[in-house]
Amino acid sequence: MKLKFYKLPLITTAFSFVFLTACSTPQSSFFLPAQTTISTLKINGMENKTGYFLETQRSRGSYNPTASLTMIKLGDEKEFKNVDTTKQDEVLFANIYGGISSLLNFRIIQPMLTYWNLVNNSLSQIGSTNDLITFKDSGYKDQLAKALANNLIVADEGNNNFWFGLKALKFDTVKLQANNTATSSTRASTTQNTNNKIDAREKITINGNGGTNNDQNATVQKLIGIENIEVEFSFVKTGFNGNEIKFEDYVTDSSPTTSLLKQVWKSKWNTELTHTSFKFKLNSFNVLLTYQLEANQKSQYLPNGFSFLFPSNLEGKIDSSKSYWNNLVDFSKRTTNEENTMLLTDLQKKQDQVNRFVGFIGQNHFTLSANSINEKQFNDASTADFFKAIFQKVSINE
């Protein structure tokens, strides 16, 4: 394959970059200035088409597609390309799935890595204290802890360096119950709510005439679920070119750079490196899509806003919306508007706690300690709650 190189402008930020891809090896080599954020992923959706999304110059926080350089690769296409704004499928893919990938990256993955990198013995604390992650192989845990805490392993000033980070991210979007409540006007409605279910690919049609006349600007929200989230951490060979970092292929057990990585690892810690990749599964969570509607307009809308909601299967934290959660198992059942309202109220209360947790990490990531995080700061959302919400309970033995 002919390699392509992308040279991107420098981004000034206090946070390290994260590189995500769902390919077994990168589709291209990237010359990236330090601090640039890249996100690439593989998604099941769009009539089972395979899609990859790449975004640079993304600011922290809410997703803003107009403030980023976005490229996509759909189906059998060989290279990334700019989004064609005249093609609905491409716009839909970039807006919806790109927004979801940003939320995954900045609201789950990056805080998780930040916490792990800065709290001493954090893997043992998370795994043993909360009975969340069980490591049958102690060497696996020790190697993962060292790699996370030293995510750029510098061997020399040349090209014999390795960066450790998130290699693969895969997830499915699934149909969930719709919340068609307009927060600005109660008269806005959709034409596709006969069974009160939605799909992430669904466009809504607003009719400005007749019995559903919406004579005011309005906001319509729809709830979708993100499931079957799989992540893989691995090493990628890097080299420096001035203030730029060059990414090459990911290291596998049989790649040409494996022996070099093991040499660098042993010289640094005097132990043998036996694992080159580390896989986890994450819990499902929900995303609230927001549609801004114009008064007296009949047209199709794509979602233009995203809100990350607390992971959907947090144990023992659901009160008023239990029937809603049961209904998610059986899509033939319907939920009432009251149940939808209670669900969103419950989720948003918990999301406020997560927001404060993530914000605290972001603002204090150089001085974070286990003692600085406690239940008092986050009401009933403790550190244990945070990680239980993110990870599936797993036993790891690779």
UniProtKB/Swiss-Prot annotation:
It is found in: Cell membrane. The keyword Transmembrane does not apply. The keyword Lipoprotein applies. It is a lipid-anchor. A lipid is attached at residue 23 (S-diacylglycerol cysteine). It comes from the Bacteria. Keywords: Cell membrane, Lipoprotein, Membrane, Palmitate, Signal. A lipid is attached at residue 23 (N-palmitoyl cysteine). Residues 1-22 form the signal peptide. Transmembrane segments: none annotated. GO terms for cellular component: plasma membrane. This is Uncharacterized lipoprotein MG095. It comes from Mycoplasma genitalium (strain ATCC 33530 / DSM 19775 / NCTC 10195 / G37) (Mycoplasmoides genitalium). The lineage of its organism: Bacteria, Bacillati, Mycoplasmatota, Mycoplasmoidales, Mycoplasmoidaceae.
